[in-house]
């Protein structure tokens, strides 16, 4: 689930309706309240649990840091100070506090293992370090600081009374005393520079006060004063300016609230080209900001309005119908003219203010960055990560691939996490890289100690989001249970299926009225807001026509704990009316627009319907499929059981992190998958287009396209697709989903589908005949498999179990033209997932559709083959638990080949060439090649170094761009023997 922006929220109560969660008494309107952000149980989002501020202040250690409080800089200064004082810091952004000298320690660092609590950088061995252990710190260990960092937050510390003072050298003592004197001197100077502000003239807040030169050693960084060494030597001066600024803003807002109506506020905002939407408190904020600092220019990304919140200016608009605009700035563009008041206004307060207005406006002073954000550039990445809690993560890793495991270990160690080579009771989680081996000793130990076992995607999300995330949605054990028990059970009646959560799937059906099928599955993913929601809407009619119900179910994708459902009985007419009302409310479009696929337009912040294809009516039910005899050969019968095993498809969907709790297995329509390809292609174009668009614009458009993809293809863990590797993975996932969609119509994933395996075999429209193990073809294929294992593929060996000859309906007729007219025909390998083979056998090998991105294809979109078996076997994606895969041997008419030594983007080879060959550095020994059926070459020689120099390819690849150049000849059932 998405993490809340901050753990706490501070504001003045909008009404008097909320009650304090601590004392249970009402929180009066305009009273300061503090809300702890928690995951809502009834909707996909976070909600504040409101408390009186005084109730929180009466408890210890509730708020860990000022940085954890959203909206603190929008409060009155006195209320800001109350929160800072509670946390224990006299300045915004720090979480340290003063402590009695007897509880403080000073010493020479014996090693470089500790990090400074303020700046998060390492404390070098032999340097002076200080600590102030407080009761509020709890059992976290001693918080150590650099000397400079300690005196910034405790400038008046009596260091001579610290424990360990006498152990320092005379030189170190002099250095410490000089630091104390310097810091005290700076504070005294700052205190003496305070001036009393005029109470009568709002505009007396002069630009000179905000733009005066900074003290030596500081630089301006995006509107904030930051010391390049990580210490802000003018923090007291900034605090003074922030106090004066806050007092001035609140004086102005109080005056506007007293003397200006909400309608006049909107008129004033409209006169200055500002956003006029929202409640009165938002209007007051925008007006006060504009009157004091000048009217804001439009967002450079989407041209919508900007507003100030949480230390920066953010866009209030949408970059597209799929996403909110993510643009933000600390130095927004301001309109270089006076702030206008409504034309013809008679409001004395506004007219008096307008006459006193100065043309030159001051620049808004922003709160200083937190210590972890203001460090040196060299340590910015590490500081950010450790400040968010990755330095607290204790983990161990298990996996079949040591290279992948070591890569993740290094990434997390770089981020500050603590790696354990073995599972011990103190670690937080065990990270599984690749398939989980249930027999692994570390896995068994983790289960015994009840340590969460999480998938490797958890690491990537932690690193991307720069913090330690909850384990719940990444637990591999939970996902396995979900795949077994939470996949929706579909009982198709007519043209649709009643949702099983309604409890009516056995006695009722979805209402159909002519062409209308009153069933909708809606989805919405917004990565900027952390939203990943679904909404199911159905009209359910009893089979006897006696009653009608409107059923709705909603929640967060992949979570059974968040959401709810409702079943309401009503007449047929009322049910249709209510269904259409809810559809309009959730999507912003009429039901008729979706049915007719005309004038339907995705609306910002609204759901989008998914195309769910339940297929046609099934064959008549049979009583007991297990008792039915099969006419298929035993080897073929076992193959059909492999191909039509529903659990295999469920496992694939789980691997892809597709939402199976609300998305019927295999029912995502072809149209939806094509739209998913289009979204990926848009992302690919944005990733390539680095010159023509500003970074902020490109980022917003990438977020919008990612939202679009994960709305169309519901996923448990949506994220922003930022790189080519991730894009390629998603494209391959969609290709696999296409085959699963095809398989769903043949396999029959419905719970009451009971066709025999013979019936399903007939639906493949492909003659499949097992070969005798003593036949010439079988022996040749076995030799080909055993000889052509590449030397670098050492993790497994291959054993041939069965070979089947193939004759797909119509394929030979299409191939005959190329067979007769092209020379250079070869029998080549092709590997694919088990879940893809129903689609392959029934429709042949297919080239990626035009709407798919070209990412991941070395030589463009085509059909790829290999002459070394292990090169293709990699794409079977088998594991220890399911070690049997399927492979193809196809006759490929290559003709004249376009030979290349490195990846080259193309749609097809040049004129006169019929295929492309990527030249590898290791090839089959040509002297061992044999001819099959007179003119087809079988490159079954052992791998040897080639004569090709400077090639970027390890092994040969063969690519054709026309499916008619391929004739599938053999299907192989292969067992993988994993060596580790």
From Swiss-Prot:
- The answer, when asked if Cell cycle is one of the entry's keywords, is no
Protein residues bound to Zn(2+) 3:
299, 302, 315, 325
Instruction: Specify where the region named Disordered lies, as residue ranges.
Output: 180-236, 360-382
Tell me one GO biological process term. response to oxidative stress
Domain (BRCT): residue spans on this chain: 385-476
Cite the residue spans of the region called Zinc ribbon.
294-338
- Location relative to the cell: Nucleus
Domain WGR stretches: 507-607
Role this protein plays: Involved in the base excision repair (BER) pathway, by catalyzing the poly(ADP-ribosyl)ation of a limited number of acceptor proteins involved in chromatin architecture and in DNA metabolism. This modification follows DNA damages and appears as an obligatory step in a detection/signaling pathway leading to the reparation of DNA strand breaks.
Name the protein family.
Belongs to the ARTD/PARP family.
The identity of this protein, by name, is Poly [ADP-ribose] polymerase 1
Q: Which organism is it from?
A: Zea mays (Maize)
């Amino acid at each position: 689930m998405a993490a809340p922006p901050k753990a706490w929220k501070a504001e003045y109560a909008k009404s008097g309706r909320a009650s304090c969660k601590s004392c249970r008494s009402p929180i009066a309107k305009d009273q300061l309240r503090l809300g702890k952000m928690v995951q809502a149980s009834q909707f996909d989002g976070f909600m504040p649990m409101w408390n009186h501020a005084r109730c929180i202040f009466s408890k210890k250690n509730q708020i860990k840091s000022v940085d954890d409080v959203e909206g603190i800089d929008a409060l009155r200064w006195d209320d800001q100070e109350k929160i800072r004082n509670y946390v224990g810091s006299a300045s915004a952004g720090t979480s340290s506090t003063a402590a009695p000298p007897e509880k403080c320690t000073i010493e020479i660092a014996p090693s470089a293992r500790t990090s400074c609590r303020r700046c998060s950088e390492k404390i070098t061995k032999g340097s002076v370090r200080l600590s102030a252990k407080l009761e509020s710190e709890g059992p976290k260990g001693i918080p150590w600081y650099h000397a400079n960092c300690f005196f910034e937050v405790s400038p008046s510390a009596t260091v001579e009374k610290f424990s360990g003072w006498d152990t320092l050298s005379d030189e170190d003592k002099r250095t410490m005393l000089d630091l104390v004197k310097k810091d005290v001197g700076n504070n005294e100077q700052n205190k003496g520079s305070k001036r009393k502000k005029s109470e009568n003239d709002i505009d007396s807040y002069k630009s000179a006060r905000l733009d005066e030169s900074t003290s030596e050693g500081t630089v301006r960084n995006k509107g904030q004063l930051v010391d390049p060494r990580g210490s802000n030597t003018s923090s007291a001066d900034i605090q003074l300016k922030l106090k004066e600024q806050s007092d001035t803003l609140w004086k102005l807002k109080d005056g506007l609230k007293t003397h200006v109506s909400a309608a006049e506020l909107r008129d004033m905002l409209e006169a200055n080209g500002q956003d006029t939407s929202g409640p009165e408190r938002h209007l007051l904020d925008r007006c006060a900001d504009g009157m004091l600092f000048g009217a804001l220019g439009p967002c450079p990304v989407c041209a919508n309005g900007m507003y100030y919140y949480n230390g920066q200016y953010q866009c209030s608009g949408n970059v597209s119908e799929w996403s909110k605009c993510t643009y933000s700035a600390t130095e927004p563009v301001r309109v270089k003219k006076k702030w206008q008041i409504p034309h013809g206004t008679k409001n004395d307060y506004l007219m008096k203010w307008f006459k006193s207005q100065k043309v030159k406006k001051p620049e808004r002073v922003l709160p200083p960055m937190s210590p972890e954000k203001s460090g040196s550039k060299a340590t910015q990445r590490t500081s950010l990560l450790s400040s968010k809690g990755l330095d607290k993560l204790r983990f161990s890793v298990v996996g079949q691939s040591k290279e992948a495991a070591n890569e993740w270990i290094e990434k997390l160690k770089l981020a500050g996490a603590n790696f354990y080579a073995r599972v011990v009771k103190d670690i937080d989680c065990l990270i599984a890289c690749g398939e989980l081996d249930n027999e692994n000793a570390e896995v068994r130990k983790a289960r015994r100690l009840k340590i969460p076992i999480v998938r490797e995607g958890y690491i990537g999300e932690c690193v991307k989001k720069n913090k330690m995330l909850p384990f719940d949605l990444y637990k591999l054990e939970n996902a396995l249970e979900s795949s077994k028990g939470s996949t929706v059970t579909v009982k198709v009646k007519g043209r649709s299926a009643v949702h099983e959560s309604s409890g009516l799937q056995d006695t009722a059906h979805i209402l159909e009225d002519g062409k209308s099928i009153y069933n909708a599955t809606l989805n919405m993913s917004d990565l900027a807001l952390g939203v990943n929601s679904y909404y199911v809407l159905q009209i359910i009619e009893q089979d006897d026509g006696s009653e009608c119900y409107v059923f709705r179910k909603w929640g967060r994708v992949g979570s059974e704990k968040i959401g709810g459902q409702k079943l309401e009985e009503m007449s047929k007419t009322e049910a249709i009316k209510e269904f259409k009302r809810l559809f309009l409310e959730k999507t912003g479009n009429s039901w008729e627009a979706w049915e007719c696929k005309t004038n339907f337009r995705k609306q910002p912040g609204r759901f989008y319907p998914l195309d769910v294809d339940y297929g046609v009516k099934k064959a008549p039910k049979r009583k007991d499929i297990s008792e039915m005899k099969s006419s298929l050969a035993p080897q073929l019968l076992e193959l059909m059981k492999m191909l039509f095993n529903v659990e295999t498809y469920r496992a694939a969907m789980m691997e892809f992190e597709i939402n199976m709790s609300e998305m019927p297995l295999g029912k995502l329509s072809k149209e939806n998958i094509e739209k998913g390809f289009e979204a990926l292609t848009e992302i690919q174009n944005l990733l390539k287009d680095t010159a023509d668009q500003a970074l902020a614009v490109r980022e917003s458009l990438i977020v919008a396209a990612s939202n679009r993809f994960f709305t169309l293809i519901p996923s448990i863990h949506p994220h922003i697709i930022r790189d080519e590797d991730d894009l390629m993975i998603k494209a391959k996932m969609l290709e696999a989903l296409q085959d699963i969609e095809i398989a769903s119509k043949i396999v029959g994933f419905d719970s009451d589908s009971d066709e025999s395996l013979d019936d399903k075999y007939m639906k493949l429209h492909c003659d499949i005949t097992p070969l005798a193990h003593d036949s010439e073809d079988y022996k040749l294929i076995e030799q080909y498999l055993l000889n052509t294992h590449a030397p670098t593929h050492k993790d497994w060996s291959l054993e041939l179990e069965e070979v089947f000859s193939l004759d797909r309906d119509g394929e030979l007729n299409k191939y005959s033209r190329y067979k007769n007219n092209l020379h250079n025909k070869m029998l080549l390998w092709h590997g694919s997932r088990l879940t893809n083979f129903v689609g392959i056998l029934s429709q042949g090998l297919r080239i990626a559709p035009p709407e798919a991105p070209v990412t991941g294809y070395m030589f463009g979109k085509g059909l790829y083959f290999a002459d070394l078996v292990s090169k293709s076997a990699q794409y079977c994606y088998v594991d220890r638990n399911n070690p049997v895969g399927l492979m193809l041997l196809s006759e490929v008419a290559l003709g004249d080949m376009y030979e290349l030594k490195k990846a080259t983007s193309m749609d097809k080879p040049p004129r006169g060439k019929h295929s492309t060959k990527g030249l590898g550095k290791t090839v089959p020994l040509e002297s061992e090649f044999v001819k099959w059926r007179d003119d087809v070459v079988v490159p079954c020689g052992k791998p040897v170094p080639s004569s090709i120099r400077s090639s970027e390819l390890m092994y040969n690849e063969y690519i054709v761009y026309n499916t008619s150049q391929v004739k599938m000849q053999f299907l192989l059932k292969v067992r993988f023997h994993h060596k580790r």
